[in-house]
Amino acid sequence: MDAVELLMNVTPNETRIALVETGMLREVHIERQAKRGIVGNIYKGRVTRVLPGMQSAFVDIGLEKAAFLHAADIVSHTECVDENEQKQFKVKSISELVREGQDIVVQVVKEPLGTKGARLTTDITLPSRHLVFMPENSHVGVSQRIESEEERARLKALVEPFCDELGGFIIRTATEGASEEELRQDAEFLKRLWRKVLERKSKYPTKSKIYGEPALPQRILRDFIGTNLEKIRIDSKLCFGEVKEFTDEFMPELSDKLVLYSGNQPIFDVYGVENAIQTALDKRVNLKSGGYLIIEQTEAMTTIDINTGAFVGHRNLEETIFNTNIEATKAIAHELQLRNLGGIIIIDFIDMQTDEHRNRVLQSLCDALSKDRMKTNVNGFTQLGLVEMTRKRTRESLEHVLCDECPTCHGRGRVKTVETVCYEIMREIIRVYHLFSSEQFVVYASPAVSEYLINEESHGLLPEVEMFIGKRVKVKTEQFYNQEQFDVVVM
């Protein structure tokens, strides 16, 4: 297993964490304080109102608005033990379940929105990378997405010994293929966490938060239990102290791997992470052989196109295509992980003439994807020669986190040519001429469009329009207009 380092860069209101494996950036995680929610937090609340007609109750958990608890969300784990199993049971009357003035431990499942308070459940769960802990329950549930009966039985047999009076577990989809040691570390971590929640429950007053969904550094460490973490470098004394306190209490095996970075250069610059992040926002990915990938992210899917680059001649073309496709499989696996691309992914490899080459490329892709922490599924080549695959989506892609829609092209990825905009201006002048009586028109446009209209490049477009309408047209440059932006003003 390759050595892994985590680099944590902390600035006011933003934390960035890079996973570097053998010197190469593999993953980037970003959290901004303004976007942190309360889903997953556990509160010691008090029922303030019971509404039998709505089968719900309002609970004061110490926030500005009272939170909402529906009768269907007051359930026990024994009624639903599989991660994806639908709850099927008869819901009791809310009046039988809670009463006004009752203290109750609840977990937030939906953020407050507008005038509505947060939505709650009494069905407390604590997640880690492989397991979900279910307090006060001895069952072991297995995600239905793990389809192999043999694997389901293996995992269940490994996890059952970890169940005790504290609770049981749900085995998550990502657990497929996990080792006994990975599962043991996950289970021990979750039980230590629950003991802390119980301790706070008895000590803290009503309307208090007794567990908060961890900040990004703690979540990342939680999810990397069992991996070959070599060093965890942190460039903030405050964050270092918080992480050290967390690892000392819940993950003592990681405490001696923490390093406080105090260099003069930013930590992401020293390790080449900053440049790698910028490169990961480009559509084009260059391959060492001279070929390249074009990665296009859309609402429906992600498409990846592979090209050979320079033409090498007919005699070696088939071998060049095959080698380029093999190289591309490794680059694709890396880019999917780095950019955090999920959902449907369509790959257009360069056309190959033999089934042997196609099968070897497909196997190379599967081998490269096997190192991904996210679940992937490769469906093979379609009749059109495209490879269909899926990758589990758990968070926004790097592009969606860091970028916004272009205000000029509105997400098209293209802007109209200067010539096209000039003809639009001419049509607008003629339209306005028929609507209003005017002696003169003034066109305000971007520098490139203004220059095209004024100079001879436009092949006399402006004089022709002036002759057509019998009016004078002036052109003025607006430095801050984008290429498609213009105004036609009547004088």
Curated annotation (Swiss-Prot):
Q: Which keywords does this chain's UniProt record carry? A: Cell cycle, Cell division, Cytoplasm, Endonuclease, Hydrolase, Magnesium, Metal-binding, Nuclease, RNA-binding, rRNA processing, rRNA-binding, tRNA processing, tRNA-binding
Q: Can you quote the record's cofactor note?
A: Binds 1 Mg(2+) ion per subunit.
Name its co-factor(s).
Mg(2+)
Listed EC numbers? 3.1.26.-
The question of whether Plastid is a record keyword is answered with: no
Pfam families xrefs: RNase_E_G (PF10150), RNase_E_G_Thio (PF20833), S1 (PF00575)
Any one GO CC term of this protein is:
cytoplasm
Query: Where does it reside?
Result: Cytoplasm
GO molecular function terms listed in the Swiss-Prot or TrEMBL record:
endonuclease activity; metal ion binding; RNA nuclease activity; rRNA binding; tRNA binding
Q: Which residues bind Mg(2+)?
A: 305, 348
Biological-process GO terms, alphabetical: cell division; rRNA processing; tRNA processing
UniProt key word Oxidoreductase: no
Q: What does this protein do?
A: An endonuclease that acts in the processing of the 5'-end of 16S rRNA and 23S rRNA. It prefers 5'-monophosphorylated substrates and cleaves single-stranded sites rich in A and U residues; contributes to tRNA processing and mRNA turnover.
The record's comment on protein family reads:
Belongs to the RNase E/G family. RNase G subfamily.
Summary of subunit composition and partner proteins: Homodimer, in equilibrium with possible higher multimers.
PANTHER family, alphabetized: RIBONUCLEASE, RIBONUCLEASE G
Q: Tell me the protein's name.
A: Ribonuclease G
In the record, what lineage is assigned to the organism producing the protein? Answer: Bacteria, Pseudomonadati, Pseudomonadota, Gammaproteobacteria, Pasteurellales
